[in-house]
């Protein structure tokens, strides 16, 4: 499962770096977070990031992620996520940086869902073996 506190730390560390409040450089940040895909997404297309209010975009994107991160996802949930991310993308005029953040966050949700399905399958198999 995705370590939620790690994702929060990545967001906080990136924001500190972006706002110039951190003495940590990009390379140190990458090493600290083992080049995590979420951090790499935040660091990509920074020219595009400069075109939007980064703190607000990050807050709005992260709120979508937080809303769904602990759910056992149903089809309706996935449809809702797609709709919410579409609206955010539209709001920020399809900004490439914003879209990349949304894609990475959805990827994290997909990882969690795949892990939940794998665990459920293993439990089901163990139950069958016990019969």
Where are these regions (language model features)?
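Amphipathic alpha-helical binding modules
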Residues: 77-131
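Short terminal alpha-helical segments
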Residues: 1-47, 58-65, 126-131
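Short acidic, glycine/proline-enriched loop segments that cap or flank alpha-helices
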Residues: 49-56, 67-77, 91-97
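Residue-level detector of well-ordered alpha-helical segments, enriched
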Residues: 6, 10, 53, 57-60, ...
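Repeat-associated, polar segments at repeat-unit boundaries in modular proteins
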Residues: 33-54, 100-117
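Generic structural signal for hydrophobic core residues of well-folded globular domains
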Residues: 14, 18, 42, 46, ...
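Cationic, hydrophobic amphipathic alpha-helical membrane-interacting segments
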Residues: 66-70, 116-119
């Amino acid at each position: 499962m995705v370590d939620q506190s790690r994702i929060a730390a990545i967001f906080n560390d990136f924001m500190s770096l972006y706002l110039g409040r951190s003495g940590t450089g990009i390379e140190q940040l990458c090493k600290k977070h083992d080049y995590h895909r979420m951090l790499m997404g935040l660091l990509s297309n920074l020219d595009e990031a400069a075109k939007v209010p980064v703190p607000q975009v990050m807050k709005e994107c992260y709120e979508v992620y937080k809303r769904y991160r602990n759910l056992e996802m149903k089809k309706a949930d996935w449809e809702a996520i797609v709709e919410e991310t579409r609206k955010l993308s539209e709001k920020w005029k399809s900004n490439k940086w914003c879209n990349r953040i949304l894609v990475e966050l959805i990827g994290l949700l997909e990882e969690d869902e795949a892990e939940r399905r794998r665990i459920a399958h293993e439990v089901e198999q163990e139950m069958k073996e016990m019969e």
